[in-house]
Amino acid sequence: AYADRSKYLGDQEFFDAPVENLISKKYAEKISKKIKSGEELKVEPGIYFYEGDQTTHFSIIDYEGNVVSNTYTLNTAYGSGIVAKGTGILMNNEMDDFSIKPGTPNVYGLIGSEANKIESNKSPLSSMSPTIVFKDSRPFLITGSQGGSMIINTVLQEILNTIEFNMKLSESNEKSRIHYQWKPSVLLHEGLNKSLIDELSKNMKLIERKIGETQ
């Protein structure tokens, strides 16, 4: 998924992504056949995992059933490091979410393509995923997370836990998590049991670290 993100995703006002094909079961089956046990993707030099905890997410529901899922960020710690004079407000450095040039990683190690190149009046590709899931036309799940490039997988696992595995939110939030973003070819994990770690370690490099926080 992160490989396709790198190639196809960007501001849809500027680039026509093949969404229907990317979410089709036929394409998913085709991609799944390319996954080979024990095969590690080549990792280019200069790709680092640097994450801060500055992104903020909140989920709110009121007594009338109105809901809000909001994620906002400066991007990296202290954003651009510039404060708007007389305001105390830090300016972000969201320009890093654009692709400097195809194949060049941003501060989170994410690779971009022409679809996400810098252009005037264009929005950069973001990992922020504030989510509201509806069931029978009513809000069923309100969620989101912080964590830079890990947000996508954190929110996905929250949705899968509650919808596919019928977990309560409190149970889902305490569950172990994993994160893999194509490049670097490293699986980040939080809270996996030893037997699973031993099994996964046979096929890839694992790093234990904190992965996002959902609300």
Where are these regions (language model features)?
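Active-site rim segments in enzyme catalytic domains, especially the processed small/beta chain
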Residues: V67-K135, F165, L169
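Alpha-helical support elements that line or immediately flank enzyme active sites
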Residues: S145-M167
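Extended C-terminal subregions enriched in glycine
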Residues: K122, E164-E213
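Short Gly/Pro-enriched turn/cap motifs at secondary-structure boundaries
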Residues: I47-E51, N116-P124, E208-G212
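Internal maturation/activation junctions in enzymes
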Residues: Y2-L74, G86-T87, E94, P102-G103, ...
